[in-house]
Amino acid sequence: MKRHILSFFSLLFAVTITAQTLNVVTGNVTYAFPAAKVGDMTCTDATTLTIGGKVFAINDINKIYVDNSEVTDNEVTVIYDGSTASLTVAGNVAPYVTPAVSGAHVSIAQSNTADVDGNEITYTLSGTSSDGEFYMSGKYKCSIEINGLSLTNKTPVYSGAALHVQNGKRVNVSVKKGTENMLTDCSSPSEDLAQKAALYVKGHAEFKGKGTLNVKGQYKHAIKAGEYITVKNCSLNVTGAVSDAVNCNQYFLMESGSISMSGVGDDGIQCDIDEDADATGETTDHEDENSGNIYITDGTITGKVTATAAKGMNANGKFVASGGAVTISTSGGGEWDSDNVKTKASACISADGDINISGGTFNLTSTGAGGKGISGDGTFIITGGDITINTSGAIAYYSGGKISTTTSSQTTERLSSNYKSSPKGIKTDGAMKLSGGTLNVIASYHEAIETKGTLDITGGVIYAQSSDDAINSGGVMTISGGTVCAYSTGNDGLDANANLTIKGGTVYAIGATSPEVGIDAQERCTLTVSGGTLVAIGGLESGAVTTQTCYQLSSSSTSSGSTNGRGGFGPGQQGGSKTWTANTWYGLYSNGTLALAFKTPSSGGSALVVSTSGTTTLKTGVTAGSDTFWNGMGASSATNGTSATITTYSSGNGWR
């Protein structure tokens, strides 16, 4: 022993003379001390050796050597190589980390780092192991750098996760530029080692870097944080998960980078309010926020969610988007929720609170029974963005102790709303306000756009198509701006279960044959047209108040003699001939200037009612320009055409 100690002091002398690095090896761990930072060294009773504040049991030391390697302060490097892992610990943080290595299973307990110039420790992970893990515990901020890592945890030692940070503070997860990485957890851990995700952070996780991280959750979630998650620059690919692809509490923020999700057994991105902390709602700069909100400011999110009643993105609070590109499809059917006594269904985007979209591009597709594009329990506000939604599922309903499906509303009309889920493009319980952006919603069954509250449209380009009401509001509907096309093949174009007022904007409403109409307000409520540019196929409901003059196309202006339900020109009359020609472009003019070019559908209600704020004229057979919108049903320019005969429409000439 005396000879080993003398050898050590000889090495120490060499280090101090040549400014080299002193390396102390214990098992698979190397502690690297730069000469300038070795500090005081003591040997106690020939049993322990203290270097730079790190106490070593001499019997645990395998080797001490000197080399010319450079040491990066505050860094711990872990290299996986098959069934083994080797660690290098920078000397300045050696007193604050306690590693344990079993094969390729690595555990590190981190203690106070406040004495290390106030800096945090960075753990750099690289290499490959088909049976390994990284587990870190502590109470201080740290960074995890993933730099060419492929890790699968087959036989857990410390946790079933591939990467587990049992640390309630902020953890940076940096995926290094140009690297492709893979994390896979254990599919069947023991109960005491059962993990919450393949990549789990107890605190808040901030993902960054410009590399790619692939994650597969074989037991529960793929990625999970006990607090918030932010994503910036890096690419996260969830290739499979038994439960959610990404799960967190407090809030989720997508700033840049990309997330792709497939093969998940529940939701794509799930954000909950942390029940162990006080709920705060949204806060400035998200400081101390516990809202359950999902924020999208930039980046790309793609997801294919197939599970029953699953959500592409599900916020316990609000959903707020100001940018980015989101493409999500859901295909799962409905299920009965016995706890809440209701039928649940899938949705591409779902929020228990408000939904606010001011920018970004959204392509949402739902094909499962009862599925929706966007579903919210609060208010729904769109001021910008480009949103495309397609839903094609049937109705999911609970009867006779099981979930069934149907495409007929008559089958479920006697069931309470809790016992059925109807597929809709957008459905919200609170007020809806649309003032900007582009919204294109097509629903094969049931409403394309529906709010249980009021609907206020002041701007934006909106196209809604459905076999049910194209746009429906439970409360007052007001249109004072925007460019709106509501096209129903089986019901009303616009339908309010209260008063409905059109006082501005451009509106093209298409209703089905009798008894449906183009624009409809609730019985004993009032439809008022006081401004804007209006086209209504199927006409207006009986008793409409038209303070701006409306006109109806004369039957002599059409080449079609077929009957198509509603028509006639006397109060309450029905069953007259259709006054317009199908699949034909018309031009609506105000004071001689084109206000709107519109294409008629293949079928619809008999009457065609028009109105503008000036002297109104109509042409048939115009040639539309290339500047089409509304899914090819509207255009801003047109040429040619033949004048059509229109006659004044009065409130007495109702179509209902």
Regions found by a protein language model. Name each.
Residues 20-70:
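Compositionally biased alpha-helical segments
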Residues 15-19:
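Sec/Tat signal peptide C-region and signal peptidase I cleavage site
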Residues 4-14:
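Sec-dependent N-terminal signal peptides
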Residues 69-656:
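A composition-driven surface/loop motif
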